[in-house]
């Protein structure tokens, strides 16, 4: 049974944060719709040429189509699954530095994320000393998002934060996790 679009986009009234997980290439009308009321937008980027290219198009669409103003500082980037001291990491960081958009976290390519997914838990639920480095980066993301919440905004648009109380996960139909 297929749900109607309005049902899929329905947000419970008690929701304080809304996470939209979308592909990098989203139709322009949909992009405008999902970013219209966004208080913050996070773009995760992997250290690969393919992902860098997709992210550059996504960010261009956010700036030019959705009219997100980078001076508002509500748009940020997260480097995802990185390995420092590699050429791909250097290439990714050069690309991200060239954007003029804040890089708020650099998530490492860690087995902690694999284990957490296998166990169906978030890394914050794992043994603290084992995930210390990963949690330091996640805390940067959470702090950045909290900055927007304390300013009175109601929605968060991201694809990297785990589900927590008062957060509703929304995925476009047919789209898997990033």
Please name every model-derived segment:
Residues 1-3, 48, 86, 128:
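Intrinsic-disorder/low-complexity, polar/charged segments
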Residues 1-28, 32, 36, 117-121:
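P-loop/Walker-type NTP enzyme "switch/lid" segment
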Residues 4-8, 62, 141, 145:
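Generic hydrophobic alpha-helical segments
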Residues 19, 43, 126-130:
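Residue-level detector of alpha-helix boundaries and kinks
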Residues 23-109:
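Conserved catalytic-core segment of NTP-binding enzymes
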Residues 74-178:
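C-terminal lobe/tail of nucleotide-utilizing enzymes
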